[in-house]
UniProtKB/Swiss-Prot annotation:
It comes from the Bacteria. This is Aspartyl/glutamyl-tRNA(Asn/Gln) amidotransferase subunit C. The keyword Protein biosynthesis applies. Disulfide bonds: none annotated. It catalyses: L-glutamyl-tRNA(Gln) + L-glutamine + ATP + H2O = L-glutaminyl-tRNA(Gln) + L-glutamate + ADP + phosphate + H(+); L-aspartyl-tRNA(Asn) + L-glutamine + ATP + H2O = L-asparaginyl-tRNA(Asn) + L-glutamate + ADP + phosphate + 2 H(+).
Amino acid sequence: MSVTRDDVRKVARLSRIAVPEERLDELAGELNGILGWIDQLNEVDVEGVEPMTSVVETKLPMRDDVVTDGNIQDQVLANAPRSEHGFFVVPKAVE
């Protein structure tokens, strides 16, 4: 699979990122390089290797799952440009 200028343009549009036309070829090359590295993982022989989540066996202590409201709603909403009735108000993203 090869990433083209059109692919970069489409991903940029979907991500709502402004990418100048003169950077499309450069970014396509970078993405193709990244995908090439990822494709190399398909060449690794993992036959007989047990799946793992980490190479280090670490036991993490569990805490009680207690629901709280945080008691800082006013502080959190103070950072928001807009809020109503204790909730964030954000611009509509999907039409």
